[in-house]
């Protein structure tokens, strides 16, 4: 090659470089149980042409790093708060909904208990009314039984009286007077009941007979006065 030395670019130099290139080490598929060696930290070495960093610049770079870390921490905290905020709101809403459901259930149970209490009070009032009706019916039955017992006692006394005086009562109407004849029979027997002077005969009383122009003359006898 132009511009190069023969010793550097010749075949001898190429053979040297070929000899310097060694084959790569064989790859071990099994991992070693020992931990890997720590990676060495590279510290920038100042070159002879560069001057060493000043302490003010180092403090400024450290403050900038701290500011960046603080900003990252604030961003992470705000993200966590933003993630936890909706969850907390949903939890509060769920708690409020659960309380509302519990209150509605308690109100429904209270209404059911109140309805049952009213029903029980109505049933008790009806039972009391029926009890009063039954008492009134029992009193009526007692009065009727008493009246029936009195009637039965009267009937028994009447039967005893009839049994004791039945023969006399049967003989009594035969010995008594005959009944008053009716008006037609009286008129057929002489019209004694139609004339005013004949009414006294049909009367039961013993009052004086009325005056009659056709009065019969008394029978003549030794005691009767002569005309």
Curated annotation (Swiss-Prot):
This is TMF-regulated nuclear protein 1. DNA-binding factor that regulates the expression of a subset of genes and plays a key role in tangential, radial, and lateral expansion of the brain neocortex. Regulates neural stem cells proliferation and the production of intermediate neural progenitors and basal radial glial cells affecting the process of cerebral cortex gyrification. May control the proliferation rate of cells by regulating their progression through key cell-cycle transition points. One of its GO terms (cellular component) is euchromatin. Ubiquitinated, leading to its degradation by the proteasome. One of its GO terms (biological process) is regulation of cell cycle. Residues 22-55 have a biased composition (Pro residues). It comes from Homo sapiens. It comes from the Eukaryota. Interacts with TMF1; may regulate TRNP1 proteasomal degradation. Keywords: Cell cycle, Developmental protein, DNA-binding, Neurogenesis, Nucleus, Transcription, Transcription regulation, Ubl conjugation. It is found in: Nucleus. InterPro entries: TRNP1.
């Amino acid at each position: 090659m132009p511009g190069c030395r023969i010793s550097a670019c010749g075949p001898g130099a190429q053979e040297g470089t070929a000899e310097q290139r060694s084959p790569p080490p064989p790859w071990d598929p099994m991992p070693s149980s020992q931990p890997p060696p720590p990676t060495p930290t590279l510290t920038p070495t100042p070159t002879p042409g560069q001057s060493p960093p000043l302490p003010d610049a180092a403090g400024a770079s450290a403050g900038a790093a701290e500011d960046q870390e603080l900003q990252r921490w604030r961003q992470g905290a705000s993200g966590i708060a933003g993630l936890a905020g909706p969850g907390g709101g949903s939890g509060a809403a769920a708690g409020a909904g659960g309380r509302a459901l519990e209150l509605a259930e308690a109100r429904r149970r209270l209404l059911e208990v109140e309805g049952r209490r009213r029903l029980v009070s109505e049933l008790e009032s009806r039972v009391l009314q029926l009890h009063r009706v039954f008492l009134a019916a029992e009193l009526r039955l007692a009065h009727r039984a008493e009246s029936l017992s009195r009637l039965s006692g009267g009937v028994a006394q009447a039967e005893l009286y009839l049994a004791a005086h039945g023969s006399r009562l049967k003989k009594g109407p035969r010995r008594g007077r005959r009944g008053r004849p009716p008006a037609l029979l009286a008129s057929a027997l002489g019209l004694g009941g139609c004339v005013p002077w004949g009414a006294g005969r049909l009367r039961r009383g013993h009052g004086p007979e009325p005056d009659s122009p056709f009065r019969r003359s008394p029978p003549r006898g030794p005691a009767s006065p002569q005309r």
